[in-house]
C-alpha cells in the first residue's frame, strides 16, 4: 500500500503551522483523508495535491508514448515485410516475370520481343 503526504493549510488561519495529511492511494477515489493532527479549523482546510496521474504520467507524455508506439509498430511492420520478401527466393513465385526470367516465358507470353541482333565485332577479321 503506497502513501504520499500532502501539505494542508487552514483556510482562515494562515499563521498556523502546516499540517501533514497522509492520503492513501487506494482510498483516493473516495477522497478519504487522514490528518495526523486535529485543529479547530480542520473542517475549513484546503488540501492541495498533485494532479491524479496514471503510470505513464501526464496527458502529454501519454500522447508522446502513443505516437512513439504507433511509429515503432509501423517501422517493425515495414522492416518485417522487407525481410520477409528478401528471404524469399524468386523460384518460389510463379508470376509472368519469374516465368520469363526462367526461360519459359516464350511459351506463356506470345508477345515476347525477339532478341536484338548482336553488334558486329571489329576483331572478327572481316573488313
Curated annotation (Swiss-Prot):
Species this chain originates from: Rattus norvegicus (Rat)
Any GO molecular function: vascular endothelial growth factor binding
Subcellular location: Cell membrane
Claim: Cell membrane is one of the keywords in the record: yes
Coiled-coil regions listed in the entry: none
Protein's gene: Fbxw7-as1
Stretches that traverse the bilayer: 70-88
Claim: Transmembrane is one of the keywords in the record: yes
Tissue-by-tissue expression: Prominently expressed in brain and heart tissues. Weakly expressed in aorta, adrenal gland, and lung tissues.
Extracellular side: 1-69
GO CC list: plasma membrane
Membrane topology (UniProt): Single-pass membrane protein
Cytoplasmic topological domain: 89-127
Phenotype for residue 64 to G: Abolishes binding with EDN1 without affecting angiotensin-2 peptide binding
Name used for this protein in its record: Dual endothelin-1/VEGF signal peptide receptor
Main location, first listed in the record: membrane
One example of a Gene Ontology biological process annotation: G protein-coupled receptor signaling pathway
Keywords of this entry: Cell membrane, Membrane, Transmembrane, Transmembrane helix
Cysteine pairs bridged by disulfides in the record: none
Role according to the record: In the Dahl salt-resistant strain, acts as a dual receptor for both endothelin-1 and the signal sequence of vascular endothelial growth factor A and does not act as a receptor for angiotensin-2. Does not bind the VEGFA mature protein. In the Dahl salt-sensitive strain, acts as a dual endothelin-1/angiotensin-2 receptor that is functionally coupled to a calcium-mobilizing transduction system, responding equivalently to both endothelin-1/EDN1 and angiotensin-2 peptides in a highly specific manner. May play a role in angiogenesis with a significant role in cardiovascular and neural development.
